[in-house]
Amino acid sequence: MANTAQAKKRVRQNIKQRERNSGLRSRLRTAIKSVRKAIVAGDKNLAETVFRKSVSIIDSIASKGIIHKNKASRHKSRLSGAVKAMG
């Protein structure tokens, strides 16, 4: 249990940060799933459109430090390859 005022404040800040970060991580997962669904559906135009939006989301989350930049690059690379492989 936090005893000092500083420790109590950090607990409050950590709760806010955890909620914000979990929301952003959820947004990331949703963006990735939407691209995967478009690929499975076989709609290349939709997949490319959703892919461009998801790249923006992935980059913004990486820039905020929620995920590492290499993880962001890995997601973008794999999604890009999957979209291009649709033919």
Swiss-Prot record:
GO molecular function: small ribosomal subunit rRNA binding; structural constituent of ribosome
Keywords: Ribonucleoprotein, Ribosomal protein, RNA-binding, rRNA-binding
SUPFAM superfamilies: Ribosomal protein S20
Domain of life per record: Bacteria
Entries under InterPro entries matching the protein: Ribosomal_bS20, Ribosomal_bS20_sf
Disordered: annotated span: 1-26
GO biological process terms held by the UniProt record: translation
Gene Ontology cellular component list: cytosol; small ribosomal subunit
Name of a matching Pfam family: Ribosomal_S20p
Family of this protein: Belongs to the bacterial ribosomal protein bS20 family.
Function: Binds directly to 16S ribosomal RNA.
Protein name: Small ribosomal subunit protein bS20
